[in-house]
Design a protein with these regions (language model features):
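RNase H-like, Mg2+-dependent phosphodiesterase core
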Residues: 1-203
Length: 203
């Protein structure tokens, strides 16, 4: 991991914050499955080689980093919001709910949360949003990996229950194969109906 991944944290340490966590989500875009979020507090300048935005890493590399992050972290938490909650309160609010649940699992209380993106929410502690934070902040990058691997594992497990959809391959995203399965089999309980309105309106 390059030292540049600690620049944002360093600025905030210098501003007086002592315990900084990173927060990121996985699964905002899929047609099926929950949205996951993770919150991670790494020790200052923890060196985790190859840590970067999880979207830029191979699945193999993410899985190698997952236990390293969990081992090195001062604290971490993983939260989800279900597909039912996504349909009820919309994906943005459900993402915030998953983040809130991840933060609630932290066994160490942070005094600042760095959150990937540009949407702020009151989580009961100081928050700073960082666009592309998953490639700029070590803590957000670590959270990105935990959220992505956790969600992928969940969707792979669901493929055993609903083998006709190929969740182990596309993880619920709107691939051609996924839409073809929807045409043939209809929806299952994992599908986000609010994401499928246009699909069914066109039929």
């Amino acid at each position: 991991m390059e030292n540049t991944m600690w620049e944002i944290e360093d600025q905030n340490y210098e501003a007086g914050f002592k315990i900084i966590c990173g927060v990121d989500e996985a699964g905002r875009g899929p047609l099926a499955g929950p949205v996951y979020a993770a919150a991670v507090i790494l020790p200052p300048h923890a060196q985790i080689p190859g840590l970067n935005d999880s979207k830029k890493l191979s699945d193999k590399r993410r899985r190698e980093l997952f236990p390293v992050i969990c081992q090195q972290a001062l604290a971490y938490g993983i939260g989800i919001a279900t597909e039912t909650e996504i349909d009820e309160i919309n994906i943005l609010q459900a993402t915030f709910l998953a983040m809130e649940r991840a933060l609630a699992q932290l066994k160490v209380q942070p005094d600042l949360a760095l959150i990937d993106g540009n949407r702020e929410k009151d989580f009961g502690l100081p928050v700073k949003t960082i666009v592309k934070g998953d490639s700029l902040s070590a803590n957000i990058a670590a959270a990105s990996v935990l959220a992505k691997v956790s969600r992928d594992d969940f969707m792979i497990a669901q493929a055993e229950k609903y083998p006709q959809y190929g969740f182990d391959i596309h993880k619920g995203y709107g691939t051609r194969a996924h839409y073809a399965a929807l045409e043939q089999y209809g929806v299952c309980p994992l599908h986000r109906m609010s994401f499928l309105k246009k699909f069914y309106e066109q039929k």
